[in-house]
């Protein structure tokens, strides 16, 4: 399971599911039949494309937290369901993504101080290439770009 998340990651996310299923199946089936299950999971993991973008992203985010680079939650994302919240600007100007034609609001959710962080740096390995394109599209929509 560690290999599936740490070394394969988003390049082939299904390998994590196979790893978990294999661990559970081995516990249920036992040896000698479990060797087939283990071989199945091992072969899938060894043949899968590799990416450590998840490891790098969480590492960069944790470094920012440790250095105190965390910022503040934008006012429009703060709870507005208590007396006095509106006077503080909480919840005002929030754009509901479901009301947007693209399903993505032209609004950021990170603190201002972290907008340039770019934690997720996708590779072009396996399925991660497609996820990188999705992340780029979402970023552009959140910045208010029209993608027509």
List each model region and its residues.
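Terminal-proximal interaction/regulatory segments of ATP-powered molecular machines
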Residues: 1-104, 111-148
């Amino acid at each position: 399971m560690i290999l599936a998340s740490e070394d394969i990651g988003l390049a082939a996310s299904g390998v994590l599911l196979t790893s978990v299923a294999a661990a559970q199946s081995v516990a249920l089936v036992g040896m000698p039949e479990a060797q087939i299950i283990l071989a199945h999971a091992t072969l899938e993991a060894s043949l899968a494309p590799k990416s450590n973008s998840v490891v790098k992203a969480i590492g960069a985010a944790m470094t920012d937290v440790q250095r105190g680079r965390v910022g503040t939650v934008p006012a429009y994302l703060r709870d507005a369901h208590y007396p006095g919240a509106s006077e503080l600007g909480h919840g005002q100007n929030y754009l509901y993504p479901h009301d947007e034609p693209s399903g993505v609001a032209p609004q950021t959710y990170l603190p201002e101080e972290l907008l340039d962080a770019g934690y997720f740096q996708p590779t072009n390995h396996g399925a991660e290439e497609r996820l990188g394109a999705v992340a780029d599209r979402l970023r552009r929509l959140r910045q208010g770009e029209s993608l027509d």
